[in-house]
Amino acid sequence: MKAISLVVVALLVVTSIIIYQRANILIYSMTSTELPQLLDPRDEGEGAVWFDDYYTIHKIDERTFAIGETRYYQLNFNYLILGDSRAVVFDAGTGQRDIGVVVASLTDLPITFIPSHLHYDHIGNDVVFDRTALVDLPHLRVRVENNKLKLTRFEHLGEVEGYPLPELTVSEWLVPNETIELGGRPLTVLYTPGHTQDSISLLDGEAGYLFAGDFLYPGQLYGFLPNSNMGDYLQGSRTIESATGVEVRVFGAHRDDALGVPELR
């Protein structure tokens, strides 16, 4: 009986350690000692143009472009959204290549970079933008000193591919449910947590576009990472449901193996 009790206690201790350290265990299991090799280039189909040997450009309309990292294993897609007076870059990949060069080939408007969330494969890391705007959340605001925000390990997750923790210079705070004006093109900031606590989506109500980041895209969604929460996912889903119509086109930040822009209708 004593032996059984000791085994039960030992199992409880081990289980408690696993639960307490689950985020560290998950990161360790995801960490690679080498950068992932680039995928072979493919014909991306009608409407897609190879910018160089890494980026593809997909024209959604005259003022909206998807910039694909179609040789990166996560198949990231970032979005250039043009107004009359300024433009938004929504996500910037890992920074393995400088997306700014691609953006400069498409517009000379002033650029504001807006990350959908703070994971390493979306913030560009070493890529520098003139202006960076972040969602206005108390747990981010309180950590800012001299407009600088140092990301935390679980916000960034960059160690899985060897990226150091970056520091972002915050030029503008985006209040959830408010509208940012690009000049003849208003975008509504939707707070859509779930994938992370800081996830946002951008809604172009006039065009019927929702840029959803990692909250929603074709393929497997990640609601189990550090900083993820399934209850928050429900909240974010309700926000999108109440803000969008049935005709909205949803553009995500990743795709599965299918060609083209990751879009849901």
Each PLM stretch: what is its role?
Residues D53-S105, L202-G213, Y217:
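Conserved beta-strand hairpin/beta-sheet module of binuclear metal-dependent hydrolase folds
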Residues Q96-E181:
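Active-site HxH/HxHxD metal-binding segment of metal-dependent hydrolases
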Residues M1-W50, Q235-R265:
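Accessory terminal helices/loops
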Residues D61-A66, N177, R185-T188:
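Short, hydrophobic/aromatic-rich segments at coil-to-beta transitions
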Residues R22-D43, S85-L106, R153-E167:
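An N-terminal domain-start capping segment
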